[in-house]
Amino acid sequence: MPVRRGAGLALAFVLVLAGMVASGAEAASRKSRASTPRVAASIVVDMNTGSILHAEAAETPRYPASLTKMMTLYVLFGYLRAGKITPDTELVVTPHAASQAPTKLGLKTGAKIKVSDAAKALVTQSANDAAATIAENLGGSEENFARVMTDTGRRIGMTKTVFRNASGLPNEEQITTARDMAILAAHLIHDYPQYYNVFETKYFTFKGRKYRNHNKLLFGYKGTDGIKTGYTRASGFNLAASVHRGNKHLLAVVLGG
């Protein structure tokens, strides 16, 4: 994809993203952020032309954190489109899934959750127990599912990404780049338009509890239609975002903001 330089709109978008990421990441304190300084990796793509409007350290390996769940959902959408499951298919929670670290829904071993609810749980609460439940029910084990995720990434052009789990919880071998995450986000938009709108979900109610999407852009930046936030201490604040303004459609990824 060609790089267009001097794209002021793209740079402004990155700055907005960086600010929103810093204020709205998943259960992370400003103190912990200040103690782990890093240079953010970023990329902005014009979705109408495929041109790269801005790129900084876009090929540098980073930890994806919960942006991992975009690939978990990409694989899930493939199962839905193939008719192997439906939105109402019930997934069974295993002890492994129930034991995942926060953030989570608090699913109990032996409980069941519908595919549609699991998908919304990933998008809003970034629920690690729901991610592991998807992985084990579709892949037999989370390890097997992670291999499918990596192989799927290679197929769509993610040349520097390796997945070891379905949630994005810390694993030194689970790496990606801003470019690869932009490729994944673009494929989610183009390949699964019938399912992509799940990323617009602002609120999700499950078992009587209401969850608010961690992506503050959905609430405060006009034209945002998704997609995902992520945070670990090792990764810093991560965000992939898709925004429509008039006839413009920009896709941006910031890793380590």
Label every model-predicted segment.
Residues 25-179, 189:
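Active-site-adjacent loops and short helices of periplasmic peptidoglycan-processing enzymes
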Residues 10-20:
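Bacterial N-terminal signal peptides
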Residues 2-8, 22-33, 39-41, 48-54, ...:
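Structured C-terminal helix/loop/strand segments within mature extracytoplasmic catalytic/sensor domains
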Residues 158-162, 170-257:
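Domain-terminus/edge residues, biased toward the C-terminal soluble/receptor-binding domains
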Residues 22, 136-137, 144-149, 194, ...:
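Contiguous hydrophobic segments
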